[in-house]
Swiss-Prot record:
This is tRNA uridine(34) hydroxylase. Residues 146-240 form the Rhodanese domain. Belongs to the TrhO family. Pfam families: Rhodanese, Rhodanese_C, UPF0176_N. One of its GO terms (biological process) is tRNA modification. GO terms for molecular function: oxidoreductase activity, acting on paired donors, with incorporation or reduction of molecular oxygen. It comes from Escherichia fergusonii (strain ATCC 35469 / DSM 13698 / CCUG 18766 / IAM 14443 / JCM 21226 / LMG 7866 / NBRC 102419 / NCTC 12128 / CDC 0568-73).
């Protein structure tokens, strides 16, 4: 029986991927449909994906599948055929092809069974995730943006919204989707008569969010088909104005796709215009934050002087410090407003 989990170190896998000569295509897709046995489905897909040298991150649950993957260019057609024939529910599934892709988004295949394919915190047994809002395509999105009766709601996290969003879109300030859902209902109560347009990166979050809004009494609810990725692709193909401003954050090694040339965010350390996310190089931190090239050199890729100093210590001393640190200090904290001021990052006023 083949091994159904990776057993090679991350460093070795990344080096192997970077040495590849064949171009790769970054693809994302999702589908809400009933999977009776997620573990068996997971194992079968793992074998299929491994045979095609697919890398990436795949989640399965009884409610469906959510995947962000990298496929060798020569295998894309075969991958599509095998995925479509794997289950009738996946036939002709929309595949979101990355917009700004160097083919180096993933270097290992990780496939996990979870309670939900996107953590939503919903416990209401009467909630019907299939009762979603109306889909909007690119031209319709642009028309809605010009409709004074429409409100665009960004269902992504704070750090995603910070580097790019649709014109005049409302942010639901939170670091997780499960935090956003109740906040969205609360914030939109005074706008129940408006047209609510929800969007996210690839469609999976805004689709479920649209169903949640309808479950909570909102009647005029839309969401963008395929999310930002599909909107930008179709708008460009059809010669339409692209009304998304800035960069689309993505959850892989690239950390972003350039949609427009606008830079709407700022370096979290010095305040200069910048929209490049990075993870703090200190292994005891790994905070996700925005850092300009000047600060990257000044702080050696770290988020603070404290982390810069710590990352320069001998490995044994770094491990000792990490072992003695409270778990609270290890939280992957993503909001700029909580940028570990105790670690030497001053609060930034922009």
């Amino acid at each position: 029986m083949p091994v159904l989990h990776n057993r090679i170190s991350n460093d070795a896998l990344k080096a192997k991927m970077l040495a590849e000569n064949e171009p790769r295509t970054t693809i994302s897709f999702y589908k809400y449909f009933t999977i009776a046995d997620p573990q068996t489905t997971r194992d079968a897909l793992y074998k299929l994906f491994t045979a095609l040298n697919v890398f990436g991150r795949v989640y399965l649950a009884h409610e469906g599948i959510n995947a962000q993957i990298s496929v060798p260019e020569s295998h894309v057609d075969k991958f599509r055929q095998q995925l479509y024939s794997f289950d009738p529910a996946l036939n002709n599934l929309r595949l979101n092809i990355a917009l700004d892709d160097d083919g180096k988004s993933f270097w290992v295949l990780r496939m996990k069974v979870r309670e939900r394919i996107v953590a939503d915190g919903i416990t209401d047994p009467d909630f019907d995730a299939s009762n979603v809002g109306n889909y909007l395509q690119a031209a319709q999105v642009n028309a809605m943006l010009d409709d004074p009766d429409a409100l665009f709601i960004d269902m992504r996290n704070h750090y995603e919204y910070e580097v790019g969003h649709f014109e005049n879109a409302m942010e639901i300030p939170a670091d997780t989707f499960r935090e956003q859902l109740p906040k969205a209902v609360e914030m939109m109560q005074e706008h129940k008569d408006k047209k609510i347009v929800m969007y996210c990166t690839g469609g999976i979050r805004c689709e479920k969010a649209s169903a949640w809004m309808k479950h909570n009494g909102f009647e005029k609810v839309w969401h963008i088909e395929g999310g930002i990725i599909e909107y930008a692709r179709k708008a460009r193909e059809q010669g339409l104005p692209v009304r998304f401003i800035g960069k689309n954050f993505v959850f892989d090694e690239r950390m972003g796709e350039r949609i427009s040339e606008d830079v709407i965010a700022h370096c979290h350390q010095c305040g200069t215009p910048c929209d490049s996310h990075t993870n703090c190089k200190n292994d005891g931190c790994h905070l996700l934050f925005i850092q300009c090239p000047v600060c990257a050199e000044k702080f050696n890729g770290c988020c603070s002087e404290l982390c810069c100093t710590e990352s320069a210590l001998p490995p044994e001393e770094q491990r000792r410090l990490r072992a003695g640190r409270e778990n609270g200090n290890k939280i992957f904290n993503k909001s700029r407003g909580r940028l570990n001021t105790q670690q030497g990052i001053p609060e930034l006023k922009i």
